[in-house]
């Protein structure tokens, strides 16, 4: 009986102990739940914004979203500058170090080094040097085949981003005009630079959230992005191609420093071709360095004295002042001006005003210039915008030189001004003068970008700068230049009436003295019955035994213009 009660007491004690333990356990659970809920409440309500901010610092990033650069095409849609897809190989150094990845030259890294032609030591140096950065470029503009190979290596921290690079289908034929871009796809020469904002648009920004491996898991709306635009040039690639080859052959055969050819549509003012030779390949990056003289578009960046190509304007002014008629006979023997002898290449005692242009007589225009006030000589040059930029929109175009503010002009100044010395212009500005003459004195802006309203704008800004009747008379005189006995007879095209003027100018050296180096010109238009195409040819420093414009440039003019008239099915007008 005693044992029974003793045992019952023990059971009671055990039950009480068990109950106490349950109570303690339940209390601990309840306390834990309360603590967890309190912590959750604290995190979710009190400091949630702060934690989200800190988290975002690790995973939320702003990404720049670039546009595909706009294409450049000719007037018929042929591509002059396009984008081809490439890849950029990138590394996340911070990710590699945060994961405490042991970077060592294993086989995969060696394969990466080999395919990119980057020494392994350099790769590791870049990673270590930028260990606090999430992003560095390892290689730019990699072919997709190479990037796919790298992708299959599955190297931690290596990322591949889409990109593009410029390709120029016509290469050397359009390089100085079109230019090229840098590694960031920004235009740094030619049309690429001049219209860079239009071609690039404006990149936008978007926020992305990444996981611990750098993969994008969420992205927010793109903001502030302005779309890029394509550009259509007035250039006709069919013209550009054959003009380049003809001019290039002429430059080589004459051992010249370089040549420029410009073709303009006279009625519209559109530039149909702008050629420089020798040229360079814009697809070969090794040729794209700043001091390469081949990069300049010399049609707009270089200025030269114009030689006899300015003489028609002196004749115009003399006709306007009724000093002469086309049949007026003028003394063309040598004359002395301020102790300087002015003479012609071929001696003629006297010539008609028309023959002064035909034979390109310096003495003839000199005597006319001496009879005209200097202010009126400057005025006629200014009316044809000599010395002024064409405002074509191409960066790098220079103004010419026409000293309108000079107070004291000697007779020698007037005389030399009449045959193209003491003033300077770009080849494009010379082409503009003769385009205006071909339009019978109606000046319109030149253009190289095709727009729906181009002709409307050109009409708005057009103005008659000189008497239409007088200019028609001068055009008839210029027609004689290409006939037998004329300075430009080698430019003659059978069956067609053409109006041309040749020119030859000595070059000034760095000391301001004239060297025995020359610039040879011919500029004119066809057909005379309906002036449609203006062509300017300039050959710089021919080193053959010939250097006169009529000998060097005239045959080039003939070959090119003859082909243009044939391609465009312009009917012969010589017998109309």
UniProtKB/Swiss-Prot annotation:
Pathway(s) the chain acts in: Cell wall biogenesis; peptidoglycan biosynthesis
Keyword Membrane in record: yes
Catalytic activity: Preferential cleavage: (Ac)2-L-Lys-D-Ala-|-D-Ala. Also transpeptidation of peptidyl-alanyl moieties that are N-acyl substituents of D-alanine
One GO MF term attached to the UniProt entry: serine-type D-Ala-D-Ala carboxypeptidase activity
Protein's GO biological process: cell wall organization; division septum assembly; FtsZ-dependent cytokinesis; peptidoglycan biosynthetic process; proteolysis; regulation of cell shape
Keyword Magnesium among UniProt keywords: no
Topology within the bilayer: Single-pass membrane protein
Class of this enzyme: hydrolase
Protein EC: 3.4.16.4
GO cellular component: plasma membrane
Residue positions of the active site: 308 (acyl-ester intermediate)
Residues annotated as transmembrane: 22-42
Cellular localisation: Cell inner membrane
Family as reported in the entry's similarity comment: Belongs to the transpeptidase family. FtsI subfamily.
Role description: Catalyzes cross-linking of the peptidoglycan cell wall at the division septum.
Name of the protein in question: Peptidoglycan D,D-transpeptidase FtsI
Organism for this UniProt entry: Buchnera aphidicola subsp. Baizongia pistaciae (strain Bp)
Name of the gene this protein is made from: ftsI
